[in-house]
A protein has these predicted regions:
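Conserved GNAT acetyl-CoA-binding A-motif
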Residues: 85-98
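Short amphipathic alpha-helix that is part of the acyltransferase structural core
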Residues: 1-31, 42, 47
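RNA-binding accessory domains that recognize and position tRNA/RNA substrates
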Residues: 30-31, 65-68, 83, 88, ...
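Conserved acetyl-CoA pyrophosphate-binding loop and the N-cap/start of the following alpha-helix
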Residues: 68, 72-80, 159
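Conserved beta-strand in the GNAT
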Residues: 40, 46-63
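A contiguous binding-surface segment within folded domains or other stable secondary-structure elements
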Residues: 60, 65-69, 249-257
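Nucleotidyltransferase catalytic core that binds NTPs
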Residues: 97-98, 102-110, 115-347
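Short coil/loop residues immediately preceding or within conserved phosphate-binding loops
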Residues: 36, 59, 144
Length: 347
């Protein structure tokens, strides 16, 4: 077999990236919008014959030229990406793949977490990673009616607080999951701290980190789904496949979501959730948004006000716990990040 080389491809290398895009296109996929490492495999004439990428702790965008399939090249590309991740300190890895490719990745030491029928499989490189996460959750399982809320809280607003209060009042135990991944302007440690402070007076709320198993729409891989509607649908169905297993571990029979009049993406997501959850015996409860100044309270409005320093409006949008934090010296690095972010609406 010929000797091929694998090397990193930088964003400035437009010629190689164009070859990669052509190769991905031949496989019916496209370059994902979220990538922080791209590699290519080259033949003796420096033609791209294979590619793969990383984002955070995930592996993405694999393809091998049809002229070279059967040579074990994808195995070499995956091995290279795993070495890159190990060098970064990422030992727990995840990937999303088409259902037909899942056996191949299974042979490379990846295990299924959940799948969306005929669409995609979510996998990790730990045999018992998700199982251990579920067993850890089970320690907080309670009798009586249990419900769930999943929120990014970027940051925690009076709207979030209202949603938690409504859900907590309707059940014996409310399991509140804060999305752990750091794809938001407000870091996870701060988001979790503000949620914890904002719900401290609700004794039946149990706070959980989502871990790597519940991800945001911002980082969901879209490269093998044909359009935005398919991406939203795929993400929602995968999230629900994961959540259904979490619900079984915690005896959850209802999931609460905030109404999304302004966001088409989240609105469609909620619609799919309300269609699918009852099939798993889980009620989907959509709570109308709390309003301030005649408008639904939104975290994006809060980020805009933090960016512009509009503290008068912030007093009508944030609970005292969040307001006190943002007025403290501790918040200065986060505020600086928000001020320098440009468009903060969809962050």
């Amino acid at each position: 077999m010929s000797e091929y080389t694998i090397s990193q491809v930088y964003p400035t290398d437009k010629t190689v990236l164009a070859q990669i895009d052509t190769l991905l296109g031949q496989e019916g996929i496209r370059r994902d919008g979220n990538l922080d490492y791209i590699c290519a495999m080259f033949d003796e004439e420096y033609n791209v014959i294979g590619t793969g990428s990383c984002f955070g702790n995930t592996l993405r965008c694999f393809a091998v030229s049809s002229a070279h399939q059967g040579e074990g090249l994808l195995n070499q590309i995956i091995t290279h990406l795993i070495e890159v991740q190990c060098a970064r300190g990422n030992m727990h890895l995840f990937l999303y793949t088409k259902v037909k490719s899942s056996k191949f990745f299974g042979d490379l030491g990846f295990y299924e977490i959940a799948q969306v029928e005929d669409t995609l499989v979510f996998m990790e490189n730990r045999r018992d990673g998700f199982g251990a996460y579920l067993r850890d959750l089970e320690k907080t399982r309670t009798e009586g009616k249990s419900a769930a809320l999943v929120m990014n809280a970027n940051p925690f607003t009076l709207g979030h607080q209202y949603l938690v209060e409504k859900a907590a009042a309707a059940c014996d135990t409310l399991h509140l999951f804060v999305v752990s991944e750091d794809a938001s302007l407000v870091p996870f440690t701060v988001r979790r701290k503000l949620v914890e402070a904002g719900v401290a007076d609700l004794p039946n709320v149990v706070l959980h980190d989502s871990g790597p198993y519940i991800i945001s729409n911002a980082t969901f891989p879209s490269y093998f789904l044909k359009d935005e509607a398919a991406v939203i649908d795929g993400h929602a169905r995968l999230d629900l496949a994961v959540f259904t297993k979490i619900a079984a571990a915690l005896n959850i029979t209802a999931r609460y979501v905030g109404e999304e009049p302004a966001s088409q993406v989240t609105g469609l997501y909620n619609q799919i959730m309300c269609e699918q959850l009852p099939k798993a015996g889980i009620e989907c409860v959509v709570v109308p948004r709390k309003e301030a100044n005649g408008k639904a309270i939104s975290a994006s409005t809060v980020r805009q006000c933090l960016q512009s320093g509009d503290w008068d409006t912030l007093e009508t949008l944030l609970p005292k716990t969040s307001l006190d934090y943002f007025r403290s010296p501790e918040a200065e690095p986060v505020l600086a990040r928000i001020r320098n972010a440009g468009n903060v609406v969809h962050y």
